[in-house]
């Protein structure tokens, strides 16, 4: 939370990882994200997103230590196309969850996303099913899955891996929900009720 404005701050994925894990303990599990088959327009959007964010995709995965204990982490990079999840990002998340299950590691997730990636349409939305299945298998293996909802977490991300934690906490003031206010206003031509989709309101109700 920004002390001056009272609004949530956008930590980068690496800033959050560095704040949570023991210093110097993070090891990435990520491999280069494929872009084959993307249209020229989408490829340019991906290039600009990589340039802006310094990341190759909208999520970073890996492992590190917390007080010396191994944990797996999945953290959104919101500056990469608003943290949206396409097929490459979904595959990265699913692979990380499956590896955490195989290696019997607790899993920490820090989503911050506008949802699935509109440039990829239905396949991106359906990829949430794979992520959800992997998370359920991790939970069924008796392993902790902890979620820190960051500002904002909406759409298919909130409806899938953002909502499956054994323990879920949220950034103060975070916008959380399925249908974001701007989408609601575009659909219904009226403003979304103020304060409904905040972390505090969801906690109270």
Where are these regions (language model features)?
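A structural preference for short, pocket-lining loop segments at secondary-structure junctions
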Residues: 66-77, 92-117
């Amino acid at each position: 939370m920004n002390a001056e404005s009272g609004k949530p701050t956008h930590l980068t994925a690496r800033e959050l990882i560095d704040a949570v894990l023991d210093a110097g303990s993070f090891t990435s599990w990520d491999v280069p994200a494929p872009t084959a088959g993307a249209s020229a327009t989408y490829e340019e959007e991906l290039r600009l997103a990589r340039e802006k964010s310094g990341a190759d995709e909208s999520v970073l995965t890996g492992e590190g230590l917390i007080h010396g204990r191994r944990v797996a982490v999945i953290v959104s990079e919101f500056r990469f196309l608003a943290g949206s999840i396409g097929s490459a990002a979904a595959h990265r998340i699913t692979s990380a969850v499956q590896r955490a299950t195989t290696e019997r590691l607790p899993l920490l997730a820090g989503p911050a996303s506008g949802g699935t990636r509109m440039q990829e349409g239905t396949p991106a939305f359906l990829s949430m099913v794979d992520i959800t299945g992997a998370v359920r298998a991790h939970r069924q293996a008796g392993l902790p899955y902890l979620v820190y909802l960051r500002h904002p977490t909406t759409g298919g991300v909130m409806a899938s891996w953002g909502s499956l934690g054994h323990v879920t906490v949220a950034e103060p003031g975070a916008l959380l929900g399925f249908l974001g206010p701007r989408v609601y206003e575009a659909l219904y031509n009226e403003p979304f009720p103020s304060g409904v989709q905040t972390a505090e309101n969801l906690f109270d109700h």
